[in-house]
């Protein structure tokens, strides 16, 4: 894996290196979610692209120059630390505003929102990239998840096939007026808002509910 040294910002192409920014894998990878960056790198390489993973830890500033970002989940304390770090080092905000995609898995979703409820019942401040809030469910949701893509309003409907994966979460996420759904749950629990709940996505911030694995179809 690459370090932050000599990081540049190429136009992605097969003759340039695509930099995958793995956000805070030192504290936000409780379930091995940093493996998403590994899978993404491998899939790019198999298609003839050069790709490197940039590990961005709590000791690093957050660069705005990566081509794509990934983030996993963690416990309450880790989420609070990560949220503060991303609010302080605002490279991710710059990158997202420039249209760089971000894949947030597990608790990475609730952390990107306005606030999320922690174990003692208090509200922890989120990063503020998504207009969502998260509270605990009565019971944990575990099992297969299938979602139907919602492409209305997207400049390029890049999703045409169902999203399939595995969900494992306690959180129930409510979308605010500025959050747009990526898909509607066909099978499974999803956000555990009423039946047919939505998976939020704003622009190219792909916060795929709490799905740990999204399967290509």
Where on the chain are the PLM-derived regions?
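N-terminal beta1-alpha1 cap of cysteine-dependent amidohydrolase-like domains
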Residues: 1-98, 133-135, 213
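Hydrophobic/aromatic beta-strand patches that form the interior of the parallel beta-sheet core
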Residues: 21, 54, 70, 103, ...
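Short low-complexity stretches enriched in small and charged residues
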Residues: 21-31, 60-63, 116-124, 159-169
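Alpha-helix termini
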Residues: 44-49, 118, 153-155
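Cysteine-nucleophile active-site neighborhood
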Residues: 76-153, 160
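Pocket-forming structural segment of enzyme catalytic cores
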Residues: 120-208
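Conserved small/polar residues in nucleotide/adenosyl-binding loops
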Residues: 211-217
């Amino acid at each position: 894996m690459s370090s932050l040294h000599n990081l540049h910002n190429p136009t992605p192409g097969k003759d340039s290196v695509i930099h995958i920014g793995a956000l805070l894998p030192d504290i936000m990878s409780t379930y091995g979610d940093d493996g998403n960056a590994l899978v993404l790198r491998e899939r790019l390489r198999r298609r003839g692209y050069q790709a490197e993973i940039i590990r961005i830890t709590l000791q690093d500033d957050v660069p705005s120059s990566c081509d794509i970002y990934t983030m996993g989940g963690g416990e309450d304390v880790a989420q609070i630390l990560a949220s503060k770090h991303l609010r302080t080092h605002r490279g991710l905000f710059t990158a997202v505003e420039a249209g760089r995609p971000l894949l947030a898995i597990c608790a990475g979703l609730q952390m990107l929102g306005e606030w999320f409820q922690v174990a003692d019942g208090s509200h922890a401040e989120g990063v503020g990239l998504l207009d969502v809030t998260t509270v605990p469910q009565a019971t944990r949701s575990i099992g297969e998840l299938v979602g139907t893509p919602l492409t209305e309003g997207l400049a390029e409907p890049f999703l045409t096939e169902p999203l399939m994966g595995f969900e494992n979460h306690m959180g129930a996420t409510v979308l605010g007026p500025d959050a747009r759904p990526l898909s509607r749950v066909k099978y499974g629990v999803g956000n555990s808002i009423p039946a047919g709940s939505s998976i939020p996505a704003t622009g190219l911030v792909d916060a795929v509910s709490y799905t740990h694995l999204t399967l290509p179809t």
